[in-house]
UniProtKB/Swiss-Prot annotation:
HAMAP family: RtcB_euk (MF_03144). Gene3D superfamilies: tRNA-splicing ligase RtcB. Ligation probably proceeds through 3 nucleotidyl transfer steps, with 2',3'-cyclic phosphate termini being hydrolyzed to 3'-P termini in a step that precedes 3'-P activation with GMP. In the first nucleotidyl transfer step, RTCB reacts with GTP to form a covalent RTCB-histidine-GMP intermediate with release of PPi; in the second step, the GMP moiety is transferred to the RNA 3'-P; in the third step, the 5'-OH from the opposite RNA strand attacks the activated 3'-P to form a 3',5'-phosphodiester bond and release GMP. The active site is at 430 (gmp-histidine intermediate). Catalytic subunit of the tRNA-splicing ligase complex that acts by directly joining spliced tRNA halves to mature-sized tRNAs by incorporating the precursor-derived splice junction phosphate into the mature tRNA as a canonical 3',5'-phosphodiester. May act as an RNA ligase with broad substrate specificity, and may function toward other RNAs. Its EC number is 6.5.1.8. One of its GO terms (biological process) is tRNA splicing, via endonucleolytic cleavage and ligation. This is RNA-splicing ligase RtcB homolog. GO terms for cellular component: nucleus; tRNA-splicing ligase complex. Pfam families: RtcB.
């Protein structure tokens, strides 16, 4: 029988590191069968939120386990190496916490892949465009501009895309990713140079994606969706690293940028759902023991594991095309309102990052080079300068890291570091992280008050479902500036640019 510890006893398994700033170590024994430690990166304030969640947990049916429990349960999965890592924006999710990083040894025949370690919105990510405009150039036409963006980019639950696409096109999207969008005229050739994996995972196989998933995805290309997804017109508020910012084409306070946050829409959700059914059915056959049934998984080299990775890669390619088409529509909106070409406005992609994805990467573990399957769920790749997988333009500064804020709060551009490779498997935060559930946000917040607060900050907003904006109110989230500063202080990413929203479209 598994021993159940009281909260005070559980704290005996958690200690603060003396060597690394903002690191809490969850020792083996916190939950059964841990193969490695859990490592939580958080300052005292952010860690208190997670400790309070653990203390107040009542094991209600249907509720997620506390994030610290989830972090430790992942540490018990077969083949995991180094540690199960939680970043400062970590909060409870399906199986894995959101903000969890976990790596599995590709040379270990028992190593697993888990859809819960990627999430339902496969390759949910963020893209940032820069312009040569200053805020004073758009301030008089800001309302017109945000309305044009809202008119051109479909938003909301179940929204339909405006790009003609048949199943043949969809298969090409799933296989070729941004290569398709370049050939089809929805991306500039240079765009993919500033995307992770250059906007295409080559192991993608459209044939493993179910008809139901394809049917859901067919009409949603170039759509924003709902939830925490958004399109924002932003202005540069602070520049912390002038050299790195200039390499990215950001060199002035007040410079106008555009950030788009979306993923693989219904197609990715269905790919994840289909894989979970396959893996739940195979768990008994494979005799894999998990502490939580939401951690359904399969061995990487099993039929189920290979199928999921091929389908996940296809959904990732879909997400890159989705953001590419919205980039095309964003450029079109600026052209129509400002009466200048996107090229003349210098509307170049700064970078495109993935927040929910699994990738095969090489890392040093215990002094040895190992090929690992990296699960990043609600976290961002943060490779250092001179890493071979970084675009040539950024070799001297490290990978740009895009950290989106909540509705009405600032966003950040960071850069990756060598210390991230050493401590977090080349990973850092992705956003702010929820503190209130969506249901609780709807219960206690008034949507009119939320909208009025945005207007008082000078933020123009267009939203498809006004009553749902309470779910994304700043009060529902941790402070993104505190999250970013915690990562900066720990050395796993460096602050580069701070961006302030001036116009927002949401579902």
């Amino acid at each position: 029988m598994t021993k159940t510890y009281k909260y005070e006893d559980q704290l005996d398994f958690i200690q603060k590191s003396d060597d690394v700033k903002n690191l809490f170590i969850i020792k083996k024994g916190f939950v059964p069968n841990m193969n490695v430690e859990g490592h939580l990166f958080a300052n005292d304030n952010l860690s208190k939120l997670l400790f309070d969640e653990l203390k107040q947990f009542t094991d209600d049916p249907g509720s997620f386990l506390p994030a610290l429990k989830q972090l430790a349960n992942v540490a018990a999965l077969p083949g995991i190496v180094k540690s199960s890592i939680a970043l400062p924006d970590a909060h409870s999710g399906y199986g894995f916490s959101i903000g969890n990083v976990a790596a599995f040894d590709m040379d270990n025949c028992n190593s697993i892949v888990s859809p819960g370690g990627v999430g339902f919105d496969i390759n949910c990510g963020v893209r940032l465009l820069r312009t040569n405009l200053l805020y004073k150039d758009i301030e008089p036409i800001k309302e017109q501009l945000v309305q044009k963006l809202f008119d051109l980019i479909p938003v909301g639950v179940g929204c339909q895309g405006k790009i003609p696409c048949d199943y043949g096109d969809l298969d090409n999207i799933l296989e070729y990713g941004m290569d398709w969008s370049v050939c089809s005229g929805y991306s500039w050739a240079e765009d993919k140079e500033h995307c992770e994996d250059f906007g295409r995972m080559i192991q993608a196989d459209p044939t493993v994606v179910s008809y139901r998933a394809k049917k859901r995805g067919l009409s949603q290309i170039g759509t924003l969706g709902a939830g925490n997804h958004y399109g924002e017109v932003q202005v540069v508020e602070e520049i912390y690293d002038e050299y790195s910012a200039k390499v990215m084409g950001i060199d002035r306070i007040g410079q106008v940028c555009i950030m788009t946050h979306s993923g693989s829409r219904g197609l990715g959700h269905q790919v994840a759902s289909d894989a979970l059914v396959d893996m739940e059915n195979s768990l008994n056959k494979s005799k894999i023991k998990v502490n939580d049934k939401q951690l359904a998984c399969a061995r990487i080299n099993s039929d189920e594991g290979k199928k999921y990775l091929k389908g996940m890669a296809a959904a990732s390619n879909y997400a890159w095309v989705n953001r590419s088409v919205m980039t095309h529509l964003t450029r079109k909106a600026f052209e129509e309102v400002l009466k200048e070409s996107a090229d003349d406005l210098d509307m170049h992609v700064v970078y495109d990052v993935s927040h929910n994805i699994a990738k095969i990467e090489d890392h040093i573990v215990d002094g040895k080079l190992k090929r690992l399957l990296l699960h990043r769920k609600g976290s961002t790749r943060a490779f250092p300068p001179y890493h071979p997988l970084i675009s040539a333009d950024f070799q001297h500064i490290g990978q740009p890291v895009l950290v989106g804020g909540t509705m009405g709060t600032c966003s950040y551009v960071l850069t990756g570091t060598q210390l991230a490779m050493d401590l977090t498997l080349g990973s850092t935060c992705h956003g702010s992280g929820r503190t209130l559930s969506r249901n609780k946000s709807r219960r206690i917040l008034d949507y009119n008050e939320v909208l009025n607060n945005l207007k008082e900050k000078g933020i123009s907003i267009r939203v498809a479902s006004p009553k749902l904006v309470t779910e994304e109110a700043p009060e529902s989230y941790k402070d993104v500036s505190e999250v970013v500063q915690t990562c900066h202080d720990s050395g796993i990413s460096k602050k580069c640019v701070k961006l302030r929203p001036v116009a927002v479209i949401k579902g």
